[in-house]
């Protein structure tokens, strides 16, 4: 009986070790988000870089009083212009043709997430215009901020200029 128990324990340990060797050494490393469309990625990266430059021109690093409605309105104006640049970017990316089925399935989902993120940014503009200041709050998807999902897709497809801006993080 002891021999059977010992043999069972050895088999279980070897199986667990083999599973970890496979997981860390041999399992595929393909990202679920990777669409393998270099032409689409190149065009998207270029358009996102252009939008990032437009937003950089809007940057205002001055401090502002969170109790000053005029200062909040000024900040809202800047964010609104940045949002406009992002919306135009997303509209342009939507027009770029994707060459494969996986991309045709995933890119619209990514763009929909980006539009949700932009809706959150628009809500923040409305909050500032109302004279109230609070931290930027974004939609959570399965407990993850939507900007992280958007950024993960951008990183996995090597379109880092398309990572959402962190200009509202306080």
Regions found by a protein language model. Give the residues of each.
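Short, Lys/Arg-rich N-terminal segment immediately upstream of the first membrane anchor
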Residues: 1-4
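Mixed-charge, polar/low-complexity N-terminal
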Residues: 6, 30, 98-100
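Hydrophobic membrane-insertion alpha-helices, especially the h-region
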Residues: 6-24
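Generic detection of intrinsically disordered/low-complexity segments and helix-coil linkers/edges
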Residues: 14-18, 34, 104, 156
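C-terminal region of N-terminal signal peptides and the immediate post-cleavage residues
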Residues: 18-40
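Alpha-helical segments in soluble extracytoplasmic regions
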Residues: 39-125, 135-170
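Amphipathic, charged alpha-helical scaffolds that flank and support histidine-based chemistry
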Residues: 128-132
């Amino acid at each position: 009986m002891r021999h059977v128990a010992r043999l069972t324990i050895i088999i279980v340990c070897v199986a667990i070790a083999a599973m970890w060797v496979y997981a860390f050494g041999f399992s595929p490393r393909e990202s679920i988000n990777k669409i393998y469309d270099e032409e689409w990625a190149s065009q998207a990266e270029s358009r996102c870089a252009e939008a990032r430059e437009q937003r950089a021109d809007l940057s205002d690093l001055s401090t502002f009083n969170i109790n000053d409605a005029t200062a909040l309105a000024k900040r809202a104006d800047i964010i609104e212009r940045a949002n406009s640049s992002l919306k135009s970017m997303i509209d342009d990316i939507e027009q770029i043709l994707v060459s494969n089925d996986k991309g045709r399935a995933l890119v619209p989902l990514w763009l929909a997430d980006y539009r949700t993120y932009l809706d959150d940014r628009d809500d923040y503009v409305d909050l500032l215009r109302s004279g109230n200041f609070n931290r930027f709050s974004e939609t959570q998807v399965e407990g993850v901020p939507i900007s992280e999902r958007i950024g993960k897709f951008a990183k996995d497809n090597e379109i880092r200029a398309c990572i959402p801006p962190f200009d509202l993080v306080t």
